[in-house]
UniProtKB/Swiss-Prot annotation:
NCBIfam families: PRK00132.1. InterPro entries: Ribosomal_Su5_D2-typ_SF, Ribosomal_uS9, Ribosomal_uS9_bac/plastid, Ribosomal_uS9_CS, Ribsml_uS5_D2-typ_fold_subgr. This is Small ribosomal subunit protein uS9. The keyword Cell wall biogenesis/degradation does not apply. The keyword ATP-binding does not apply. PROSITE patterns: RIBOSOMAL_S9. Gene3D superfamilies: 3.30.230.10. Coiled coil: none annotated. Belongs to the universal ribosomal protein uS9 family. GO terms for biological process: translation. One of its GO terms (molecular function) is structural constituent of ribosome. Keywords: Ribonucleoprotein, Ribosomal protein.
Length: 130
């Protein structure tokens, strides 16, 4: 990665994304693969591009991402959060628009732990009256 780059760390569920942003042609590389190849679902690809589309930087910036942990939804959310933080590092004037869209806030929802005596976090064993 030559020249000036902007960095942002994004987190969502159990995923962590490290995002490097440089001036370029608009390509997004996730773990060495293009975003369209990395994510099977169209919604995941859309989530990743949301901050770029909102700030009208989709064609002017290249993005390189390293993402670990979690599944497709968590990883795409982590990448979106990381891209948002990198964009703020790139241009602080973008923060109000990104904040208004809700991209700056880290989604704090995590998986609830399984409790003893229950089948899942809240699901109890089936009760039989007779």
């Amino acid at each position: 990665m030559n020249g000036k780059y902007y960095y942002g760390t994004g987190r969502r569920k159990s995923s962590v994304a490290r995002v490097f942003l440089t001036k370029g042609t608009g390509q997004i590389i996730v773990n060495g693969r293009p975003v369209d190849e990395f994510f099977a679902r169209e919604t995941s690809r859309m989530v990743v591009r949301q901050p770029l589309v909102l700030t009208e930087n989709a064609e002017s910036l290249d993005i390189k991402v390293n993402v670990v942990g979690g599944g497709e939804t968590g990883q795409s959310g982590a990448i979106r959060h990381g891209i948002t933080r990198a964009l703020i590092d790139f241009d602080a004037a973008l923060k109000p628009a990104l904040s208004q869209a809700g991209f700056v806030t880290r989604d704090a929802r995590e998986v609830e732990r399984k409790k003893p005596g229950l089948r899942k976090a809240r699901r109890a064993k089936q009760f039989s009256k007779r």
